Amino acid sequence: MKIAAFDIGGTALKMGVVLPHGEIILTKSAEIIASDGDQILAEMKLFLAENTDVTGIAVSAPGYVNPKTGLITMGGAIRRFDNFNLKEWLEAETGLPVAIENDANCALLAEKWLGKGQDLDDFLCLTIGTGIGGGIFSNGALVRGGRFRAGEFGYMFSERPGAFRPGKYTLNETTTMLVLRRQYAQLTGRPLKEITGEEIFANYDAHDPISERLINEFYTGICTGLYNLIYLFDPTHIFIGGGITSRPTFITELKHHMASFGLRDTIIETATHKNQAGLLGAVYHFLQEENRHE
């Protein structure tokens, strides 16, 4: 059996062919312009036309995803996918079985299937990028919530909200790599497009005062979220993903800041699969669905 896997993002579509034991035998990616949902659908059709020997389709998608019906009630940055049933569309186009799951849940399922969560019953995954996402595995099961919105950790408040536009006090608005770059651009008077997270952290290592202040605030925001999650879910482990985790000293620095919060005994580590987590988690969900229907 070969499974076509898709990991849908607002700026890129990752595609692959994966075997049932988790070996990825082919990968491809496409840049997505302006979160264009129609372009995503066209790229998926093209990939499937190029790989006619696949026998199923596994999808990792952003937003609020009903994995039972395939309906995406809110597509995140991809507004074309609001109230769109991607599972039904793919099945009609190909005649193949399709399984779809939320992207953050797929990252968690990859960790459960072929990562550090294989023997764990209570753990969380937290992803730090342009936004903050997450997945919850509690009492031996993935937690999706009554409306498939569980794990939207980025909507937690990072500080006491003001009366006007309280959403600007959430982790998504205060503690992401995009926010860090915007803050640095504002303070230095440089264009945002010229600034990378790598540059800011390099300046932090060189003891640049602006970078030190911003990154200390960045870590404090992450620790605030972790503190809340630890006391909400009592996980034994939290695995963190996102480009920031490629920094060798990230976990050490995070734990240093976390010490003042009272870390307790929760183990915090980086996630295993990096950019392949979405593809692998989608395939694991597909295999679970196939087994359930047999």
Swiss-Prot record:
Statement: the UniProt record of this protein carries the keyword Transcription: no
Signal peptide (from-to): none
UniProt-listed Gene3D superfamilies: 3.30.420.40
Enzyme class: transferase
Catalysed reaction equations from the record: D-cellobiose + ATP = 6-phospho-beta-D-glucosyl-(1->4)-D-glucose + ADP + H(+)
InterPro entries reported in the protein's UniProt record: ATPase_NBD, ROK
Record-linked PANTHER family: BETA-GLUCOSIDE KINASE, ROK (REPRESSOR, ORF, KINASE) FAMILY
Family named by the database record: Belongs to the ROK (NagC/XylR) family.
Entry protein name: Beta-glucoside kinase
